[in-house]
Amino acid sequence: MLAPRGEARRKQLRTCALATGLGDKAVSLLYERVLRKERLELWIERCQAQISGVLDVLEKERAAVKTPYFFGERIGHADIAVACVLRFTGEAHAALFDAARYPALAAHSARCEALPPFAEIVQPLAPPSGD
């Protein structure tokens, strides 16, 4: 699901790193909003800016690709990582992942989530309550 070596592998790993970094920030933002009694607005703003920045980069890269998946005709690890983090980010922070602002990512997510393995294991977000 990843190229074995070379530039193709580095590009795929970069996309995976962007996706997992986005996930880290989305989780951090959720925790800050839900679990902390005294919210740090600076941290919230920083997380939101970083999330938006990564979404902008991924949107630009996905929009430039004319194949069904990021790196060709077959789904790869990067596609799965991006689709999963988009699901989480969209459920946890709907205002940050707007399909109108990120149409290529929204289409990518929909394409992946329409696949049987995604449909079989989908788990809607049940965030902590903070209690």
Where are each of the predicted segments found?
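C-terminal end-helix/capping segment
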Residues: 100-119
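GST superfamily/GST-like fold recognition
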Residues: 70-95
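Carbohydrate-binding/catalytic loop surfaces
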Residues: 126-131
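Surface-exposed helix-capping loop/turn segments at secondary-structure junctions
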Residues: 60-71, 116-122
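Residue-level preference for long, well-ordered alpha-helices that form the structural scaffold
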Residues: 40-43, 47, 101
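GST-like domain detector, emphasizing the conserved glutathione-binding G-site
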Residues: 1-42
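All-alpha amphipathic helical-bundle segments outside canonical DNA-binding/catalytic cores
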Residues: 3-11, 66-78
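Amphipathic alpha-helical packing segments from all-alpha helical-bundle domains
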Residues: 44-64
